[in-house]
Each structure stands twice: as C-alpha cells, then as structure tokens.
C-alpha cells in the first residue's frame, strides 16, 4: 500500500495581483502540505496574503500556476459545480464573521452543512454541542447569543460533517482575549474529535500556541516558524 496522501498539498503555486503599478506576490513557487493528525497556525503581516492562501486551499480563489490538492483530489481539475460539492463534503470553513442564519435555531444552524452533505449524525452533533459547551443553547436563535456563543455554533457547523480539513480565518478576531483563548482551545479539541486537520489564520502568538506547528507567510514564501 502506498503512502497516505496529505490532507492538503500546495505544489509549486504562484499567485499575484496588481495594485496600481505594483505587483503583489502572494505565492512564489510555494509548496506546503499537512498530514492527518497535525494542525497549523498561519501567521504573517497584514496584507501578506494569508486569507488569499486559505481561499486557494478552499478552492475559493485560483492560482496562476501550480496544483492544489485536498485529500488527494486536485481542485484545479474540478468544474465549478464539482468544486462546490467537494467543498461541502470535504471542508469546514470558519470566519471572523459567524454567518449564522437568523431564522434558525443554534442546533439547525450547526446541522446545516452536515444535512446538505447528507451525513448528519445526531449522536455526534450532541457530542459537539457538549464539547463546545452550548448544549443548553440549542433552541436559541443567533440574536439571543453572545459573540462567543455564536462562534461556537459556527465551529459546530464547520465540524458536524467531519470534514477532512477545517480552515479558520481569524476565528476569534471579534472576541475578547479570555473568550478567544477558550474558543480556540475548544476548537482544537472538537476538530480532533471530528478527525479533522485544522489550519488557523491568526495574528496572535497565544492562539498559535494551541496548534502543533506555526508557519509564517512573507513575500510569497512560507517559513516554518515553530
């Protein structure tokens, strides 16, 4: 049996865009992969391209050249509809803004992606809500929840379908320091329970300390910082 495929793999990718008369390089012949059982913090200065790199891994942005694979599947070969279906099944996405549906309860918001993917499992949903400390909030709507509670619901939504890969872009950017530390700790624990590899974009060294490795993006290159 051959070696197990990396959860995601960027192979010699290039990505740039023009800002007035200047060419901004997000990636220059950049390669990066992460195996199952590992997670990573992605750091860098503002404008370095961290969010763009995450969008490339998620298939939300294209590369100028190179290959992007998730679970061994090349995203560059998929049609738009195939990519949407693949993303729904294989990825969990968490953003600084929670994007919860106001008319749905916390439970139905969290179950949304798993139900769309046809893999909703009530027992795992119960486990996630207990792990994240929101089991008593299941019937409340987003407007009745604090920012930290809403982010925990968003985390449950991203993990409930047990995706191969979870990408979190500044997931605690709107939370205070104490709440942020608690939410990141719960995110790492819940991702492990779901069997998901986790990548977190952050400016915070404290948050990066919760992850097993830290990478820094600068001038189109990645440096393994810790």
Where are these regions (language model features)?
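H-loop (His-switch) and adjacent beta-strand-loop-beta switch element
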Residues: 214-226
